[in-house]
Amino acid sequence: MIIVCDTRQQAGKHDLKERYFAEQGIATVRSKLIVGDYTRLDNQTVAIDTKKDVLELAGNICGGQHERFRNECTLAQKCGIRLVVLVEEEPPHGDVGLWQAPKTKQGKLLSQVKGGVLKKAMATMTERYGVEFEFTTREQSPARIVELLEEIGR
């Protein structure tokens, strides 16, 4: 299997994944993807869009990035691509509805989005566009990417 990594991924922020892929003998190439951050070179029917944490997800779904994110979900749906959003942070007790935005050192919330609102918005995105959401740890993320891409064609 050869994994395609989107060229718009920030350099140096994904070394853990790249190292894991190399250790597993999985080749990678960089190319601009129409949706997501990772897919297979030989079968692009699944794309994985990674988010570093729930705060980034909240910004994409309920914040200033909503239109761009929605457009990406719509494009995936139109192209018959299964889009999996892999969030590299596990919410409290496995329930994003319990999530609370982190605070700055001054005690100000980094986002006004509440966990319950985010959970409902995620359900709406799944219902309308078929996008799937999964939560994992940063350390387990590379293995989960490989698992999801290996499922293609089974």
What name fits each language-model region?
Residues 1-43, 56-154:
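Non-catalytic C-terminal interaction segments of nucleic acid-processing enzymes
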